[in-house]
Amino acid sequence: AVNESDCIEVDGESVVYAKYEYYVMNKPQGVITATEDSRQDTVLDLMEENRRKDLFPVGRLDKDTVGLLLITNDGDLNHRLLSPKKHVDKEYVAKISGRVTEEDVKTFAKGIFIEDGFRALPAELKILSYREKATEEDLLDVEQSNAPQKHLSQGITEISIVIHEGKYHQVKKMFHAIGKEVFFLKRIRMGTLLLDEELAEGTYRKLTADELSGLMRITCKEK
């Protein structure tokens, strides 16, 4: 069972050993989503040194992508969340160089070809705001990303997008396919799990019982 616990003794004191642990992290820019790397800092390097050694991130966020990341040692849940058969929602907010149009919204809703004949599943794209001139924060975001700056003169659109699969660089490739570039990307939801806005970037906490049961509920459904 997922909540199975064993009572063990450490230095003569009884402690509860949980079989599985679940954490939500607000991933910052500049760290990679991996368990270990000899050259770059990983998301697990942000956790306490006495953490369990069998923890791993569920899925991956690019080095310059921020936001919600689930970390656990539950391989079954990891498999179900990432299974193409489950189509678990992933929601992002992003800044796009160039004007995103209602025509783009319709294109994404139909499913867009992004590379090598691969067609992404229909995605829900919403335009949140548009501004003609980049702010200092925008310029900093561009500097910290690998996105080209050629479209900044065409304004900046802030959007939200829900995708139902998790291909490599998928959101960035979807916008690139319509001639626009993502220069800031933040994941705010995975299935029923929402990013805790009280979590500062680079910090984490354990999932609540309600958060965990929500993930179990959506991934245990047959699809």
Enumerate the predicted regions with their spans.
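Basic, flexible Lys/Arg- and Gly-enriched helix-loop patches that mediate nucleic-acid binding at interfaces
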Residues: A1-K223
